[in-house]
Amino acid sequence: MSSTDQPLSSDSPSDKPLLFLAHVQALKQLPRTGWLFAGVAQPESVADHSFVMSWVALLLAEQINLAYHEQGLDQPLDVAKIAQIALVHDLAESILTDLPKRSTDLLGKAVKHQAEALAMQQICQHLPNHAHYLACWQEYVDGATPEGRLVRDADKLEMIHQAFCYEQAGQRNLGEFWQAQQWHYPLSRNFFEELWRLRHHHS
């Protein structure tokens, strides 16, 4: 066996990005369980959701930054930070899987958050700047920064947009995904209201 054929040592610095990417790769095979319980035969994966949600977040952020004072902000959003928060927000599911709402309701928010935090520590230990990415994830969970709140809006908007797409393809009984939505930014509400209008226009 040549030196290039040797497997990477678990102590090799070059192995760490691959260990991290194994978690990212796992999200491509992990279905979003909410759609499964709703009867969607071939639902999107967590990776599908994260990719589109990242774009929703970026589009919202860039639009908000054109007139950020009108959205209740004192300064423009950090678009690079938003992209990082969006990309890490569901990484814990590579270990915990996409827990259905009925499970998280029984476990409680505190238990779920503790498990997610442990999973994120395990995943991000392979990154050179692991503390930064853990902080990005915490910003999403807490929603205590303008960027974290924007990504939380984008997460819900992507779900609702996906529900809209499934309904346009003939799926029924997805009304629960449209209910009781609260928004941090007026632009997010506008996005939702436009989807709502289109939904009823096509019904």
What are these regions (language model features)?
Residues 1-203:
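Alpha-helical, largely C-terminal catalytic domains
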